[in-house]
A protein has these predicted regions:
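Cysteine-centered catalytic environments shared across enzyme families
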Residues: 1-334, 347
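Residue-level signal for short amphipathic helical patches enriched in basic/charged
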Residues: 75, 338, 357
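Active-site adenylate/phosphate-handling loop in enzymes that bind or generate adenylated species
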Residues: 135, 147, 259, 286, ...
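Long, Lys/Arg- and hydrophobic-enriched amphipathic alpha-helices
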Residues: 335-343
């Protein structure tokens, strides 16, 4: 929370209540940093540097204090850290949080082009804010502005609590009904509440905001042969998965038996012995399953083959219809908007079960979209847009 003109110290109690709504996102730690014009709060899920990465994190350089609240992970943090050390920066922790704030001090907004990872963060310094979101918008970041007041949050519900009201935005609602469960980048279904767009950053100063884009997808002609393309994808997938194994807590994998999760499990098992894997099933699924064009059989035997091949420690979570129905409201509240009904509730329940033993789980959810493998993309009557033809974007 930031207010250029007004004293926010009388808002600490209310701010604390707002932050409490996010404790389920980060149950390991809960802290607030307050000053006259800025309140920063953080609920932490400890993954890297369990003791040294507490937030809000303060870093002092040239007698200027920088305070950051950060959600995400920078996979190439060690490379960036070595570069910063060579340039004279000092570190007191092993966390990527400190690397992010030091990178901003050293390079300004250009630091965002160095980060290979997923992130959203706010840095406060000299009564100014720098706010940023990762290239693909994996990590959420919402904001509200009225006059000199700005509120930022990972979830909309905190902003709604402060406002004490909920006004639906007509355009956002139309988009939700037409594009559901999504709306166009930057929009939400609530009036005056916005999402910072992926690959954008915001400077806030003197009660004003300035938003800029720092990265964009590039269109490039794809001239590689089939064999070269297979090799390239194999290298990229291996590199991506290996980077995401950076963790000070155990890592697990979701395993559905499909290509995506099976590949992730196979690669991960090269680096983690006796890997834990999880699958979800539904009560009486064997009785009611109906084969169709894109899934002719149940996935059980594929799961069995993969878990046996890689010798994983496997657990299947079985959900009942009643459980799915009963968790619909909770999944709706978690999303702060209507979503994908039973898909949301089943994923919520599945994730809860995994969280009893693991904080980190790798998933192949939506990975098939990268290579347009979903059936909606391969219908015979699907029209290929000229802009995408023969290109890798």
């Amino acid at each position: 929370m930031y207010d250029y003109m007004n004293d926010l110290t009388n808002q600490v109690q209310n701010f604390n209540k707002m932050l409490t709504l996010l404790k389920y996102r980060g149950p390991d730690d809960f802290n607030i940093a307050s000053s006259e014009h800025v309140l920063l709060g953080h609920c932490r899920l400890s993954i890297i540097d369990l003791n040294g990465g507490k937030q809000p994190f303060k870093y002092t350089y040239n007698d200027i204090e920088y305070t950051i609240v950060y959600n995400g992970e920078i996979y190439n943090m060690n490379t960036i850290k070595e570069q910063l050390i060579d340039e004279g920066y000092h570190f007191t922790s092993q966390s990527d949080t400190e690397v992010v704030v030091a990178s901003f001090i050293a390079y300004g907004p250009r630091c965002l082009n160095l980060f290979d990872g997923i992130f959203s963060f706010v840095i406060s310094y000299q009564n100014k804010l720098f706010v940023a979101r990762d290239q693909l918008g994996v990590k959420p970041l919402y904001y509200y502005q009225k006059d000199d007041l700005f509120i930022f949050s990972s979830e909309i519900k905190c902003i709604l609590m402060y406002l004490g009201r909920c006004v639906v935005d007509e355009t956002g609602l139309k988009e939700l009904l037409g594009l559901g469960p999504s709306v166009s980048p930057g929009k939400t279904i609530y009036k005056d509440i916005y999402s910072l767009r992926p690959a954008h950053y915001m400077n806030v100063f003197n009660g004003y905001k300035e938003i800029n884009r720092y990265w964009a997808l590039e269109r490039r002609n794809h001239n590689r042969s089939y064999e070269e393309t297979v090799h390239d994808i194999r290298c990229l997938v291996n590199h991506s998965i290996r980077q995401q194994l950076l963790s000070d807590v155990p890592v697990s994998c979701m395993l559905s038996g499909g290509l995506d999760s099976s590949i992730i499990t196979g690669v991960t098992s090269q680096y983690i012995s006796k890997l834990s894997t999880y699958s979800v099933d539904y009560q009486d699924q064997d009785k009611y399953f109906q084969p169709y064009e894109y899934q002719t059989t149940r996935d059980d035997h594929y799961i069995d083959e993969v878990k046996t091949l890689y010798n994983t420690k496997h657990k299947t979570v079985t959900l009942s219809q009643k459980q799915l129905v009963m968790s619909l409201k909770e999944s709706l509240i978690a999303r702060d908007a209507p979503g994908m009904a039973d898909i949301d509730s089943s994923f919520l329940l599945f994730s809860k079960e995994i969280s009893h033993n693991h904080k980190v789980v790798l998933s192949g959810e939506c990975a098939d979209k990268i290579l347009v493998a979903t059936h909606g993309f391969i219908e015979k009557n699907f029209t290929v847009l000229t802009a995408f033809h023969g290109c890798v974007i």
